[in-house]
């Protein structure tokens, strides 16, 4: 009998001039990873949702892209490196 794997995490994104209440949810159920993007804009009371089921290669590409972006942005800046590490630790400890 295989063990059911479950994990969920929500990342709130900052507001911009044209959108608010943006969130990215990463869900794992069994062996499937789903990324859910939710947002609500000022022009409509409607809440929008976009779901994407990611395969292993897509998860790897997303992780690689985020890792490279973080490496380029953080660089050798000690303060940013500490903040980045704290954010990673927060996710790992959930």
UniProtKB/Swiss-Prot annotation:
Pfam entry (one) = TA_inhibitor
Checking InterPro entries in the record gives: TA_inhibitor
Q: What is this protein called?
A: Gene 4.5 protein
Q: Which gene encodes it?
A: 4.5
């Amino acid at each position: 009998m295989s063990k059911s794997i479950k994990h969920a995490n929500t990342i709130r994104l900052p507001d911009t001039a044209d959108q608010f209440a943006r969130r990215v949810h990463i869900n794992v159920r069994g062996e499937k990873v789903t990324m859910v993007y939710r947002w609500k804009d000022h022009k409509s009371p409607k809440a929008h949702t976009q779901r994407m089921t990611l395969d292993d290669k897509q998860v790897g590409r997303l992780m690689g892209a985020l890792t490279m972006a973080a490496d380029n942005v953080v660089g050798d800046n000690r303060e940013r490196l500490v903040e980045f590490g704290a954010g990673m630790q927060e996710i790992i400890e959930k």
